Amino acid sequence: MMLSCAPFTVTSDPAKSQDAALLAQTSDACARLRQAVGSVIVGQDAVVDHLIVALLTQGHALLVGVPGLAKTLLVSSLSRALDLSFGRVQFTPDLLPADITGTDVLTERDGRRELSFLPGPIFKNLVLADEINRTPPKTQAALLQAMQERAVTVGGATHPLPAPFQVFATRNPIEQEGTYALPEAQLDRFSLEVHVEYPSEEEERKIARRTTSGSSPEVARVLAADELRMLQAFIPRVPVTEQAVELAVRLTRATRPAESSSAEVKNYVRFGSGPRGSQALVLAAKANAAIRGDAAADVEDVLALALPALRHRLVLSYRAEVDGVKDADVVAAVKKLVKV
């Protein structure tokens, strides 16, 4: 769903007037953010839209796509446009938890030796966890704690991460050798799973011209980190219609085999989404409405975000693999079935 600006209504109530101003600011900032990222990234409009939603909701996002589709460039461009500190961790089989979180090191001060904490690369506002499924479960667990608690624990001491703190991870869907399956608990911590597809023929021509011209366009700064935090604090206050909440809950519950009347769910899903799916979907719908400049999130916003908010929370059966049924097929079937 493409994002566009829409009119809003100003009211005499001071609190509502402030929210109306923030709504306009959010819509304008996101339009400028898309333009800034578009100066570097060709196409991928839907991907950019979904990552902006993740940013506004303070959520983590999992980007799935084959190598060479500019996933790293996209995330780093977002960080530059938002003036956020950026960290990249290349996940490998020999990566240790301390390589991510940091470690205590022995230092000498005033003639005395003491342990001091040396922060790892995760102590940034926006962290790219590249090929997250290439590292063992122990290291994945360290990242999970940081994503969940926005803090890391080393040597019995807890160190808070900077605010905002968000993880955008990547996963290569075609290489399985030497990889470790992401546990459901970790997948559930991602607000959205965003699939990055191949560019169109015309977009690929533009990419070929732009990347071989010898020049590298700069990404303009759109927002400062404190301005982003202000917009993030505003998103939960965006109104949402009862129909939208009802649809989000029904869609989530319809992914569970014991409760669903969908043949696709009963035949191909072992476990459906938990309540966190409903929460992520409603919050994403609020962000989507704010980006478009709408005063309240509605059914259309829920439908637009249903696939990225729910697909990674489904555990498909072996039969689904045999029959070639994907998570997107199941979510599409559920969307057709559920009405409000």
Q: Where would I find each of the regions flagged by the language model?
A:
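Canonical AAA+ ATPase core
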Residues: 107-112, 131, 135-139, 147-237, ...
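Conserved beta-strand position immediately N-terminal to the Walker
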Residues: 61, 127, 165
